[in-house]
Regions:
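Double-stranded beta-helix
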Residues: 94-102, 107-112, 127, 131-182
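A short, N-terminal "cap"/entry segment at the start of jelly-roll beta-barrel domains
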Residues: 1-53, 100-109, 169-182
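Histidine-centered metal-chelating micro-motifs
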Residues: 65-67, 87, 107-128, 145
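Conserved hydrophobic/aromatic beta-strand scaffold that supports enzyme active sites
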Residues: 57-59, 78, 117-119
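Conserved short histidine dyad/triad with adjacent acidic residue
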Residues: 57-75
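Short glycine/proline-enriched turns and hinge-like loops at secondary-structure junctions
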Residues: 71-72, 80, 130-133
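A short, compositionally biased micro-patch
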Residues: 61, 81, 121-123, 131
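Glycine- and acidic-residue-biased ligand/ion/polar-headgroup-sensing regions
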Residues: 74-94
Length: 182
């Protein structure tokens, strides 16, 4: 299956003038993530990649490798946890970990000194590592989104379509062998 087909199985764009997200939407997100090849799915609350605000509800099942990347300095992004927990690793240019943000939904908030919300306003390489069976978060980023311009992948990390064992080994290395679920 080519990358474009996988992408179509992992996202939907909202075409309504107003949209709310409730319990049934979360249930549907999980069902769609379960069906997708990479066990992830997103509802884009914006109607296209051209919208000036890119706003998504993202669902990840289990460990999911989201290659370290950064955005141009004009782009800021934030994550707000809805369910589960995740860690965001920030890197320097060489791939050395410079900071770790531990995030969790309200039901996990007292565990391991986790926060609800994270925001990145600089062009810094970052990696998201899900920490629970289901990780669901609200992401907001400056648009419009053009993958060739809006995302620069880190050369120091394996590509997203690498052998899954290679992704696991890389994440074990940067997390000191801790990619286990909470």
């Amino acid at each position: 299956m080519n990358k474009e087909n996988i992408k179509n199985l992992e996202a939907e764009f909202n075409q309504l003038p107003a949209k709310s997200v409730g319990k049934m939407d979360i249930k549907n997100l999980k069902e769609m993530a379960n069906k997708s090849p990479r066990k992830r799915y997103r509802i884009c609350l914006h109607n296209s990649t051209n919208h000036p605000t890119q706003e998504m509800i993202i669902c990840l099942k289990y460990f999911n490798y989201l290659r370290p990347h950064r955005h141009p300095s004009r782009v800021s992004e934030s994550y707000h946890l809805i369910e589960g927990a995740l860690d965001v690793y920030l890197f320097d240019q060489k791939g050395e970990v410079k900071d770790i943000f531990k995030l969790a939904a309200p039901d996990f908030i007292n565990q391991e000194n986790r926060s609800l919300l994270y925001r990145l306003s600089n062009s810094i390489f970052h990696l998201v590592i899900p920490r629970t069976e289901w990780t669901i978060y609200h992401e907001v980023a400056t648009g419009p989104f053009n993958k060739d311009i809006s995302v620069e992948y880190a050369n120091f990390a394996p590509p997203e379509d690498c052998d899954p064992k290679e992704a696991v080994e890389y994440c074990k290395k940067i997390t000191n062998n801790n990619i286990h679920l909470l």
